[in-house]
Protein backbone atom coordinates (compact mmCIF):
# COMPACT_ATOMS: atom_id res chain seq x y z
CA UNK A 1 0.00 0.00 0.00
CA UNK A 2 1.39 3.40 -0.94
CA UNK A 3 2.28 5.96 1.71
CA UNK A 4 2.31 8.83 -0.78
CA UNK A 5 0.82 12.04 0.57
CA UNK A 6 -2.17 13.27 -1.45
CA UNK A 7 -3.78 16.68 -1.38
CA UNK A 8 -7.33 17.08 0.00
CA UNK A 9 -8.56 18.45 -3.33
CA UNK A 10 -7.00 15.46 -5.10
CA UNK A 11 -9.17 13.12 -3.03
CA UNK A 12 -12.19 15.35 -3.66
CA UNK A 13 -11.80 15.43 -7.45
CA UNK A 14 -10.89 11.72 -7.63
CA UNK A 15 -13.92 10.84 -5.51
CA UNK A 16 -16.20 12.96 -7.69
CA UNK A 17 -14.82 11.40 -10.88
CA UNK A 18 -15.02 7.89 -9.48
CA UNK A 19 -18.59 8.54 -8.37
CA UNK A 20 -19.58 9.75 -11.85
CA UNK A 21 -18.20 6.64 -13.54
CA UNK A 22 -19.53 4.13 -11.00
CA UNK A 23 -22.98 5.75 -10.94
CA UNK A 24 -23.20 5.67 -14.73
CA UNK A 25 -22.43 1.94 -14.78
CA UNK A 26 -24.87 0.98 -12.01
CA UNK A 27 -27.69 3.51 -12.54
CA UNK A 28 -30.24 1.03 -13.99
CA UNK A 29 -30.01 -0.85 -10.68
CA UNK A 30 -30.55 2.44 -8.82
CA UNK A 31 -33.70 3.02 -10.89
CA UNK A 32 -35.06 -0.46 -10.12
CA UNK A 33 -34.39 -0.01 -6.40
CA UNK A 34 -36.07 3.40 -6.26
CA UNK A 35 -39.12 2.08 -8.11
CA UNK A 36 -39.32 -0.92 -5.77
CA UNK A 37 -39.22 1.34 -2.72
CA UNK A 38 -41.99 3.64 -3.95
CA UNK A 39 -44.11 1.68 -6.45
CA UNK A 40 -46.50 0.20 -3.87
CA UNK A 41 -47.47 3.68 -2.74
CA UNK A 42 -47.94 4.86 -6.32
CA UNK A 43 -50.11 1.83 -7.16
CA UNK A 44 -52.17 2.49 -4.06
CA UNK A 45 -52.68 6.11 -5.09
CA UNK A 46 -53.80 4.98 -8.54
CA UNK A 47 -56.38 2.64 -6.98
CA UNK A 48 -57.68 5.50 -4.83
CA UNK A 49 -58.08 7.66 -7.94
CA UNK A 50 -60.07 4.89 -9.64
CA UNK A 51 -62.19 4.49 -6.53
CA UNK A 52 -62.97 8.22 -6.36
CA UNK A 53 -63.87 8.29 -10.05
CA UNK A 54 -66.46 5.49 -9.68
CA UNK A 55 -69.76 7.17 -10.59
CA UNK A 56 -72.23 4.83 -8.86
CA UNK A 57 -70.30 4.93 -5.58
CA UNK A 58 -70.75 1.18 -5.08
CA UNK A 59 -67.07 0.67 -4.39
CA UNK A 60 -66.39 1.43 -0.75
CA UNK A 61 -62.92 1.79 0.75
CA UNK A 62 -63.34 -1.43 2.70
CA UNK A 63 -64.51 -3.43 -0.30
CA UNK A 64 -61.89 -2.09 -2.67
CA UNK A 65 -58.70 -3.92 -3.46
CA UNK A 66 -56.61 -1.01 -2.22
CA UNK A 67 -55.38 -2.97 0.76
CA UNK A 68 -54.59 -5.91 -1.49
CA UNK A 69 -52.51 -3.64 -3.68
CA UNK A 70 -50.67 -2.26 -0.68
CA UNK A 71 -49.87 -5.79 0.47
CA UNK A 72 -48.98 -7.18 -2.95
CA UNK A 73 -45.31 -7.93 -3.38
CA UNK A 74 -43.97 -6.72 -6.70
CA UNK A 75 -40.92 -8.54 -8.03
CA UNK A 76 -37.93 -6.77 -9.52
CA UNK A 77 -38.62 -8.47 -12.85
CA UNK A 78 -42.18 -7.11 -12.91
CA UNK A 79 -40.86 -3.63 -12.18
CA UNK A 80 -38.32 -3.97 -14.99
CA UNK A 81 -41.02 -5.12 -17.44
CA UNK A 82 -43.28 -2.22 -16.45
CA UNK A 83 -40.53 0.35 -16.95
CA UNK A 84 -39.55 -1.09 -20.34
CA UNK A 85 -43.20 -1.30 -21.43
CA UNK A 86 -44.15 2.22 -20.35
CA UNK A 87 -40.96 4.14 -21.13
CA UNK A 88 -38.57 1.89 -23.00
CA UNK A 89 -34.90 1.34 -22.19
CA UNK A 90 -34.42 5.06 -21.55
CA UNK A 91 -36.75 4.70 -18.55
CA UNK A 92 -33.91 2.94 -16.74
CA UNK A 93 -31.94 6.17 -16.98
CA UNK A 94 -34.60 8.64 -15.84
CA UNK A 95 -32.96 11.19 -13.58
CA UNK A 96 -29.42 10.14 -14.56
CA UNK A 97 -28.34 13.74 -15.10
CA UNK A 98 -29.44 14.75 -11.61
CA UNK A 99 -27.89 11.60 -10.12
CA UNK A 100 -24.53 12.33 -11.73
CA UNK A 101 -24.68 15.92 -10.55
CA UNK A 102 -25.68 14.76 -7.08
CA UNK A 103 -23.04 12.04 -6.73
CA UNK A 104 -20.29 14.34 -8.02
CA UNK A 105 -21.16 17.04 -5.49
CA UNK A 106 -21.72 14.49 -2.70
CA UNK A 107 -18.41 12.70 -3.24
CA UNK A 108 -16.46 15.93 -3.72
CA UNK A 109 -17.78 17.40 -0.48
CA UNK A 110 -17.49 14.11 1.41
CA UNK A 111 -13.91 13.26 0.45
CA UNK A 112 -12.68 16.82 0.85
CA UNK A 113 -14.04 17.22 4.38
CA UNK A 114 -13.14 13.63 5.30
CA UNK A 115 -9.49 14.18 4.41
CA UNK A 116 -9.42 17.67 5.93
CA UNK A 117 -11.05 16.55 9.20
CA UNK A 118 -8.97 13.38 9.38
CA UNK A 119 -5.68 15.23 8.92
CA UNK A 120 -6.69 17.86 11.47
CA UNK A 121 -7.50 15.20 14.07
CA UNK A 122 -4.31 13.31 13.23
CA UNK A 123 -2.09 16.35 13.72
CA UNK A 124 -3.77 17.29 16.99
CA UNK A 125 -3.18 13.80 18.34
CA UNK A 126 0.50 13.97 17.25
CA UNK A 127 1.54 17.57 18.01
CA UNK A 128 5.23 16.77 18.47
CA UNK A 129 5.60 15.27 14.99
CA UNK A 130 3.13 17.62 13.32
CA UNK A 131 5.26 20.62 14.30
CA UNK A 132 8.28 19.08 12.58
CA UNK A 133 6.76 17.53 9.49
CA UNK A 134 3.25 17.14 8.11
CA UNK A 135 4.01 13.85 6.42
CA UNK A 136 5.49 12.22 9.53
CA UNK A 137 2.22 12.78 11.39
CA UNK A 138 0.10 11.55 8.53
CA UNK A 139 1.98 8.33 7.79
CA UNK A 140 0.76 6.88 11.07
CA UNK A 141 -2.80 6.98 9.73
CA UNK A 142 -6.12 7.52 11.49
CA UNK A 143 -7.39 5.53 14.42
CA UNK A 144 -10.85 3.95 14.29
CA UNK A 145 -12.50 6.74 16.28
CA UNK A 146 -10.76 9.40 14.19
CA UNK A 147 -12.04 7.77 11.02
CA UNK A 148 -15.56 7.56 12.46
CA UNK A 149 -15.44 11.21 13.54
CA UNK A 150 -14.16 12.33 10.14
CA UNK A 151 -16.84 10.24 8.43
CA UNK A 152 -19.56 11.72 10.63
CA UNK A 153 -18.48 15.30 9.90
CA UNK A 154 -18.05 14.72 6.17
CA UNK A 155 -21.25 12.69 5.90
CA UNK A 156 -23.38 15.27 7.71
CA UNK A 157 -22.11 18.17 5.60
CA UNK A 158 -22.52 16.29 2.33
CA UNK A 159 -26.01 14.98 3.18
CA UNK A 160 -27.37 18.41 4.12
CA UNK A 161 -25.71 20.16 1.17
CA UNK A 162 -27.00 17.70 -1.44
CA UNK A 163 -30.45 16.74 -0.10
CA UNK A 164 -32.30 19.07 -2.56
CA UNK A 165 -30.45 17.40 -5.44
CA UNK A 166 -31.54 13.91 -4.33
CA UNK A 167 -35.15 15.05 -3.84
CA UNK A 168 -35.14 16.27 -7.44
CA UNK A 169 -33.45 13.05 -8.57
CA UNK A 170 -36.05 10.81 -6.92
CA UNK A 171 -38.86 12.85 -8.48
CA UNK A 172 -37.24 12.74 -11.92
CA UNK A 173 -36.62 8.99 -11.64
CA UNK A 174 -40.11 7.99 -10.44
CA UNK A 175 -42.48 10.72 -11.59
CA UNK A 176 -40.98 11.79 -14.90
CA UNK A 177 -43.78 10.02 -16.77
CA UNK A 178 -46.61 11.24 -14.52
CA UNK A 179 -45.29 14.80 -14.22
CA UNK A 180 -44.32 15.52 -17.79
CA UNK A 181 -43.02 19.01 -17.10
CA UNK A 182 -40.73 17.79 -14.32
CA UNK A 183 -39.28 15.11 -16.58
CA UNK A 184 -38.17 17.73 -19.12
CA UNK A 185 -36.23 19.86 -16.62
CA UNK A 186 -32.59 19.66 -15.67
CA UNK A 187 -31.55 19.32 -12.03
CA UNK A 188 -31.43 23.03 -11.18
CA UNK A 189 -34.72 23.68 -12.98
CA UNK A 190 -36.34 20.74 -11.17
CA UNK A 191 -35.19 22.11 -7.80
CA UNK A 192 -36.62 25.54 -8.69
CA UNK A 193 -39.86 23.89 -9.88
CA UNK A 194 -40.27 22.06 -6.56
CA UNK A 195 -39.34 25.22 -4.66
CA UNK A 196 -42.00 27.30 -6.41
CA UNK A 197 -44.79 24.71 -6.29
CA UNK A 198 -44.23 23.05 -2.89
CA UNK A 199 -41.97 25.35 -0.90
CA UNK A 200 -38.38 25.14 0.30
CA UNK A 201 -39.30 22.66 3.05
CA UNK A 202 -39.95 19.98 0.42
CA UNK A 203 -36.34 20.18 -0.73
CA UNK A 204 -35.29 18.99 2.72
CA UNK A 205 -37.87 16.26 3.26
CA UNK A 206 -36.13 13.02 4.07
CA UNK A 207 -33.24 14.89 5.70
CA UNK A 208 -33.71 13.02 9.01
CA UNK A 209 -33.34 9.52 7.49
CA UNK A 210 -30.60 10.95 5.28
CA UNK A 211 -28.66 12.00 8.38
CA UNK A 212 -29.19 8.53 9.83
CA UNK A 213 -27.55 7.25 6.64
CA UNK A 214 -24.32 8.94 7.73
CA UNK A 215 -23.94 5.70 9.70
CA UNK A 216 -23.58 3.78 6.43
CA UNK A 217 -19.99 4.77 5.56
CA UNK A 218 -19.05 4.78 9.26
CA UNK A 219 -20.20 1.15 9.64
CA UNK A 220 -18.55 0.20 6.36
CA UNK A 221 -15.21 1.76 7.29
CA UNK A 222 -15.21 0.34 10.83
CA UNK A 223 -15.77 -3.19 9.50
CA UNK A 224 -13.13 -2.59 6.84
CA UNK A 225 -10.54 -1.39 9.36
CA UNK A 226 -11.15 -4.20 11.84
CA UNK A 227 -10.93 -6.91 9.18
CA UNK A 228 -7.87 -5.26 7.65
CA UNK A 229 -6.10 -5.27 11.01
CA UNK A 230 -7.03 -8.95 11.44
CA UNK A 231 -5.59 -9.89 8.03
CA UNK A 232 -2.40 -7.90 8.63
CA UNK A 233 -1.96 -9.61 12.00
CA UNK A 234 -2.57 -13.12 10.66
CA UNK A 235 -0.73 -12.91 7.32
CA UNK A 236 2.03 -10.54 8.49
CA UNK A 237 1.66 -8.32 5.42
CA UNK A 238 -0.24 -5.31 4.18
CA UNK A 239 -3.51 -5.95 2.38
CA UNK A 240 -3.53 -6.00 -1.41
CA UNK A 241 -5.92 -3.95 -3.59
CA UNK A 242 -7.96 -7.13 -4.12
CA UNK A 243 -8.17 -7.62 -0.34
CA UNK A 244 -9.29 -4.02 0.07
CA UNK A 245 -11.88 -4.44 -2.67
CA UNK A 246 -13.39 -7.54 -1.04
CA UNK A 247 -13.31 -6.06 2.47
CA UNK A 248 -14.90 -2.84 1.24
CA UNK A 249 -17.65 -4.80 -0.52
CA UNK A 250 -18.33 -6.88 2.61
CA UNK A 251 -18.44 -3.76 4.78
CA UNK A 252 -20.86 -2.16 2.31
CA UNK A 253 -23.03 -5.28 2.42
CA UNK A 254 -23.43 -5.12 6.20
CA UNK A 255 -23.85 -1.33 6.27
CA UNK A 256 -26.56 -1.42 3.59
CA UNK A 257 -28.56 -4.16 5.35
CA UNK A 258 -28.49 -2.17 8.61
CA UNK A 259 -29.40 1.22 7.12
CA UNK A 260 -31.72 0.13 4.29
CA UNK A 261 -34.98 0.98 6.12
CA UNK A 262 -33.83 4.60 6.28
CA UNK A 263 -33.04 4.53 2.56
CA UNK A 264 -36.61 3.36 1.89
CA UNK A 265 -38.08 6.02 4.19
CA UNK A 266 -36.05 8.72 2.48
CA UNK A 267 -37.26 7.65 -0.98
CA UNK A 268 -40.90 7.53 0.20
CA UNK A 269 -40.59 11.01 1.74
CA UNK A 270 -39.03 12.40 -1.44
CA UNK A 271 -42.09 11.45 -3.52
CA UNK A 272 -44.57 12.36 -0.81
CA UNK A 273 -45.81 15.96 -0.88
CA UNK A 274 -46.05 18.11 2.23
CA UNK A 275 -49.87 17.99 2.09
CA UNK A 276 -49.85 14.18 2.04
CA UNK A 277 -47.59 14.07 5.09
CA UNK A 278 -49.88 16.52 6.91
CA UNK A 279 -52.91 14.41 5.97
CA UNK A 280 -51.24 11.30 7.40
CA UNK A 281 -50.51 13.05 10.70
CA UNK A 282 -54.08 14.39 10.87
CA UNK A 283 -55.47 10.94 10.05
CA UNK A 284 -53.57 9.40 12.96
CA UNK A 285 -54.99 12.05 15.29
CA UNK A 286 -58.53 11.55 13.95
CA UNK A 287 -58.31 7.78 14.34
CA UNK A 288 -57.20 8.25 17.93
CA UNK A 289 -60.17 10.52 18.70
CA UNK A 290 -62.67 8.21 16.99
CA UNK A 291 -61.40 5.27 19.03
CA UNK A 292 -62.61 6.93 22.27
CA UNK A 293 -65.97 5.77 23.75
CA UNK A 294 -68.90 8.04 22.81
CA UNK A 295 -71.39 7.35 25.63
CA UNK A 296 -69.15 6.24 28.45
CA UNK A 297 -70.30 2.63 28.12
CA UNK A 298 -66.75 1.56 27.33
CA UNK A 299 -65.24 3.58 30.15
CA UNK A 300 -64.08 0.46 31.96
CA UNK A 301 -62.40 -0.83 28.82
CA UNK A 302 -60.75 2.53 28.30
CA UNK A 303 -59.38 2.50 31.85
CA UNK A 304 -58.20 -1.04 31.37
CA UNK A 305 -56.38 -0.13 28.14
CA UNK A 306 -54.87 2.93 29.80
CA UNK A 307 -53.63 0.76 32.63
CA UNK A 308 -51.93 -1.52 30.14
CA UNK A 309 -50.17 1.46 28.54
CA UNK A 310 -49.22 3.76 31.44
CA UNK A 311 -46.62 5.56 29.35
CA UNK A 312 -48.83 6.19 26.32
CA UNK A 313 -49.72 9.74 27.33
CA UNK A 314 -46.11 10.57 28.14
CA UNK A 315 -44.92 9.17 24.81
CA UNK A 316 -47.59 11.18 22.99
CA UNK A 317 -46.45 14.38 24.69
CA UNK A 318 -42.82 13.69 23.82
CA UNK A 319 -43.66 13.01 20.18
CA UNK A 320 -45.75 16.20 19.98
CA UNK A 321 -42.69 18.22 20.97
CA UNK A 322 -40.38 16.65 18.40
CA UNK A 323 -39.45 18.61 15.25
CA UNK A 324 -41.92 18.06 12.41
CA UNK A 325 -39.39 16.27 10.12
CA UNK A 326 -38.85 13.61 12.79
CA UNK A 327 -42.61 13.28 13.39
CA UNK A 328 -43.16 12.96 9.63
CA UNK A 329 -40.57 10.20 9.40
CA UNK A 330 -42.07 8.20 12.27
CA UNK A 331 -45.62 8.78 10.97
CA UNK A 332 -44.68 7.51 7.53
CA UNK A 333 -42.76 4.58 9.01
CA UNK A 334 -45.66 3.57 11.24
CA UNK A 335 -48.07 3.80 8.30
CA UNK A 336 -45.83 1.56 6.19
CA UNK A 337 -45.57 -0.97 9.02
CA UNK A 338 -49.33 -0.99 9.64
CA UNK A 339 -50.41 -1.23 5.98
CA UNK A 340 -47.56 -3.10 4.30
CA UNK A 341 -45.68 -4.91 7.06
CA UNK A 342 -42.03 -5.03 8.03
CA UNK A 343 -41.05 -6.31 4.58
CA UNK A 344 -41.96 -2.92 3.07
CA UNK A 345 -38.85 -1.43 4.67
CA UNK A 346 -36.68 -3.92 2.78
CA UNK A 347 -38.42 -3.84 -0.60
CA UNK A 348 -35.81 -3.78 -3.37
CA UNK A 349 -33.02 -4.79 -0.99
CA UNK A 350 -31.57 -7.50 -3.25
CA UNK A 351 -31.05 -5.12 -6.16
CA UNK A 352 -29.79 -2.41 -3.81
CA UNK A 353 -27.20 -4.77 -2.37
CA UNK A 354 -26.01 -5.66 -5.85
CA UNK A 355 -25.88 -2.00 -6.86
CA UNK A 356 -24.14 -0.89 -3.65
CA UNK A 357 -21.48 -3.60 -3.81
CA UNK A 358 -20.77 -3.00 -7.51
CA UNK A 359 -20.81 0.75 -6.99
CA UNK A 360 -18.37 0.49 -4.08
CA UNK A 361 -16.08 -1.74 -6.15
CA UNK A 362 -16.13 0.55 -9.18
CA UNK A 363 -15.76 3.64 -6.99
CA UNK A 364 -12.74 2.14 -5.23
CA UNK A 365 -11.10 1.25 -8.54
CA UNK A 366 -11.81 4.50 -10.40
CA UNK A 367 -10.93 6.70 -7.42
CA UNK A 368 -7.52 5.06 -7.04
CA UNK A 369 -6.87 5.42 -10.76
CA UNK A 370 -7.95 9.07 -10.83
CA UNK A 371 -6.24 10.00 -7.55
CA UNK A 372 -2.72 9.98 -8.97
CA UNK A 373 -3.84 11.92 -12.05
CA UNK A 374 -5.76 14.59 -10.14
CA UNK A 375 -3.02 14.91 -7.53
CA UNK A 376 -0.40 15.45 -10.24
CA UNK A 377 -2.49 18.13 -11.94
CA UNK A 378 -3.29 20.00 -8.72
CA UNK A 379 0.27 19.89 -7.36
CA UNK A 380 1.70 20.98 -10.72
CA UNK A 381 -0.74 23.88 -10.77
CA UNK A 382 0.22 24.87 -7.24
CA UNK A 383 3.93 24.77 -8.05
CA UNK A 384 3.38 26.87 -11.16
CA UNK A 385 1.37 29.46 -9.25
CA UNK A 386 3.38 29.50 -6.03
CA UNK A 387 0.77 27.77 -3.84
CA UNK A 388 2.76 24.62 -3.09
CA UNK A 389 3.21 25.57 0.57
CA UNK A 390 -0.51 26.11 1.13
CA UNK A 391 -2.14 22.83 0.00
CA UNK A 392 -5.45 23.12 1.83
CA UNK A 393 -6.85 26.44 0.63
CA UNK A 394 -9.38 25.64 -2.08
CA UNK A 395 -10.13 29.34 -2.68
CA UNK A 396 -6.49 30.03 -3.54
CA UNK A 397 -6.44 27.10 -5.94
CA UNK A 398 -9.46 28.50 -7.77
CA UNK A 399 -7.78 31.91 -7.95
CA UNK A 400 -4.68 30.22 -9.32
CA UNK A 401 -6.66 28.84 -12.25
CA UNK A 402 -8.12 32.31 -12.89
CA UNK A 403 -4.63 33.80 -12.72
CA UNK A 404 -3.29 31.26 -15.19
CA UNK A 405 -6.11 32.01 -17.60
CA UNK A 406 -5.74 35.78 -17.25
CA UNK A 407 -2.05 35.57 -18.23
CA UNK A 408 -2.93 34.37 -21.73
CA UNK A 409 -4.48 37.50 -23.19
CA UNK A 410 -6.36 40.68 -22.19
CA UNK A 411 -9.49 39.23 -23.78
CA UNK A 412 -9.30 36.09 -21.66
CA UNK A 413 -8.72 38.17 -18.56
CA UNK A 414 -11.80 40.28 -19.28
CA UNK A 415 -13.90 37.14 -19.69
CA UNK A 416 -12.62 35.72 -16.40
CA UNK A 417 -13.38 38.91 -14.49
CA UNK A 418 -16.84 39.12 -16.04
CA UNK A 419 -17.67 35.52 -15.13
CA UNK A 420 -16.49 36.13 -11.57
CA UNK A 421 -18.76 39.16 -11.34
CA UNK A 422 -21.75 37.08 -12.42
CA UNK A 423 -21.08 34.56 -9.69
Swiss-Prot record:
Q: Where in the cell is it found?
A: Peroxisome membrane
Q: Where are the Solcar repeats?
A: 6-120, 142-230, 239-373
Give a yes or no for keyword Repeat in this entry: yes
* Biased composition range(s): Basic and acidic residues: 43-53
- What SUPFAM superfamilies does the record tag this protein with? Mitochondrial carrier
Present the record's domain note. Lacks a typical peroxisomal sorting signal.
Family named by the database record: Belongs to the mitochondrial carrier (TC 2.A.29) family.
From the Swiss-Prot or TrEMBL record, give the protein name.
Peroxisomal membrane protein PMP47A
Organism (species): Candida boidinii (Yeast)
Q: Which gene encodes it?
A: PMP47A
Amino acid sequence: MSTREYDDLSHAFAGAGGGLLSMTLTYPLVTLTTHAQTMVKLKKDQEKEKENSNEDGSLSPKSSNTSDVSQKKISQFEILKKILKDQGAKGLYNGLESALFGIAVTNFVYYYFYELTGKTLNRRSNPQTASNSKKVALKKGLSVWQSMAAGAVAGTISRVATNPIWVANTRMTILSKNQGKLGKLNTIEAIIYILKNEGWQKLFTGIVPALFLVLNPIIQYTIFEQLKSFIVKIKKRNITPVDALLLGAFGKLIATIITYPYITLRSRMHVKSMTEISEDVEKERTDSVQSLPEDGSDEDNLKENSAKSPYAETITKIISKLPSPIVSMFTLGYGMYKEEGVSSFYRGLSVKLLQSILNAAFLFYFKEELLILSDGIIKSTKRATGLANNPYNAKDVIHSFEKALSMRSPRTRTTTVASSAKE
